[in-house]
From Swiss-Prot:
Keyword Signal: no
PROSITE patterns in the cross-refs: SAM_MT_TRM1
Protein name according to UniProt: tRNA (guanine(26)-N(2))-dimethyltransferase
Family: Belongs to the class I-like SAM-binding methyltransferase superfamily. Trm1 family.
Lineage per the UniProt record: Archaea, Methanobacteriati, Methanobacteriota, Methanomada group, Methanococci
EC number of the protein: 2.1.1.216
Length: 375
């Protein structure tokens, strides 16, 4: 075992974790950025929707890193109080270590239980303000229980999926089984939109609408934060934002859910904005003030810039140039050129070779031809 500090929280963790389902105790150092973003987004949400009491559940707690950071670093009642955290895990070794870590940080606002995640969530119907599902693989086995355990208005469902190849379209049949959706291959933004769409459909049967406030595809995982909205009308509004997408040589064709599916289209995808701009701006400020990882700030800033261009999909410049057999312009030069043509453009957080823009594919191709001709 060794001791580290993550954020403002001390943790005792395994010396050599292999990061697999077979680990006796699960701690993933790569996910520090994930946890930095999580604390920042939830704190930003708390700043907007402050309460006298706030209950959070981390039902797949592992060593307790995520739940204990929530307990130690989140503030309620305008900074005078702390939330109540429930951490669960089915692994007794993980529970013992989480308890040690709670003592290490002198936390008395944490309840640590040895229990299956679905059992823990099912025993706490409509109790939690936040439920954070962070499994090894797909979140779908826990999603129904999680939705039923969250308050139906102004709660947050936080969800990680590490089966990115499934969401990314490499395993079509598995995606249909796990997410009841047909994936398009090779687009990380659409992987996020597919996960969000699945959660919206799951929540709608309980007359709960889900509205994404922040989402990202970083490293080996997809992560999303969804706010609950109460009532059949809100559920219907969320479902109406789902639809189908078709990709023809990097041009995205969109069809609404009401138009129905047809050959070549995949989905259902969430087709509206994935980001709450105000919550994200505040989260960036929080992360900077607390000296969280530079990478977490970078991800949030880029996601914020993407949110200002509210459309579906992005352009992979390398793929476009390969299709038209032209030289690849530097991304910064391409974005400047599009700006001069009157379009908005920014980098994406998930692919250094792609941009998000309100330009059409033909406009981007036109610039690439001019760039190639001048070389």
């Amino acid at each position: 075992m060794k001791y580290i500090t993550e954020g403002n929280t001390k943790l005792k963790i395994p010396e050599d974790a292999t990061i697999s389902k077979k680990d006796k105790i699960f701690y993933n150092p790569i996910m520090e950025v994930n946890r930095d973003i999580s604390v920042s987004i939830v704190q930003s949400f708390l700043n907007k929707y402050d309460r006298d009491e706030f209950f959070i559940c981390d039902p797949l707690g592992g060593s307790g890193a995520r739940g204990l950071r929530y307990a130690n670093e989140l503030k309620i009642n305008s900074g005078t109080g702390a939330p109540h955290i429930t951490i669960g895990d089915i692994n007794p070794n993980a529970i013992s270590l989480a308890q040690e870590n709670a003592k290490l940080n002198n936390l008395n606002n944490v309840n640590i239980v040895h229990k299956d995640a679905n059992v823990l969530l099912s025993e706490n119907f409509r109790k939690f303000n936040v439920v954070d599902i962070d499994p090894f693989g797909a979140p779908s086995p826990y999603l129904d229980s999680a939705i039923r355990s969250i308050i139906t208005k102004n709660g947050i469902l936080c969800m990680t999926a590490t089966d990115t190849a499934v969401l990314y379209g490499s395993y079509r049949k598995t995606c249909i089984r796990n997410y009841d959706a047909t994936p398009l291959k090779g687009n990380k933004e659409l992987a996020i939109r597919l996960l969000v769409g699945h959660a919206i459909r799951m929540a709608s049967k309980y007359d709960i609408g889900l509205k994404p406030i922040f989402s990202h595809f970083t490293a080996h995982y997809v992560r999303t934060f969804l706010m609950t909205e109460r009532g059949a009308k809100k559920a219907d509004e969320a479902v109406d934002k789902l639809g189908y997408v078709k990709n023809i040589e990097e041009e995205y064709i969109i069809k609404s859910r009401k138009e129905g599916n047809s050959d070549g289209f995949c989905g259902l995808y969430y087709l509206d904005n994935l980001t709450d701009e105000n919550i994200t701006k505040d989260a960036i400020k929080i992360a900077e003030e607390r000296n969280y990882s530079k990478e977490s700030v970078k991800v949030m800033k880029t996601v914020y810039e993407e949110s200002l261009i509210n459309n579906v999909g992005c352009y992979d410049v390398h793929k476009i140039c390969k299709n038209i057999k032209k030289k690849v312009p530097p991304v910064d030069i391409l974005m400047s050129g599009l700006n001069e043509m009157g379009f908005n453009a920014c980098r994406t957080h998930h692919n250094p070779h792609s941009i998000k823009s309100d330009a059409k594919l033909i406009d981007i191709v036109e610039f690439i031809y001019k760039y190639d001709g001048n070389k």
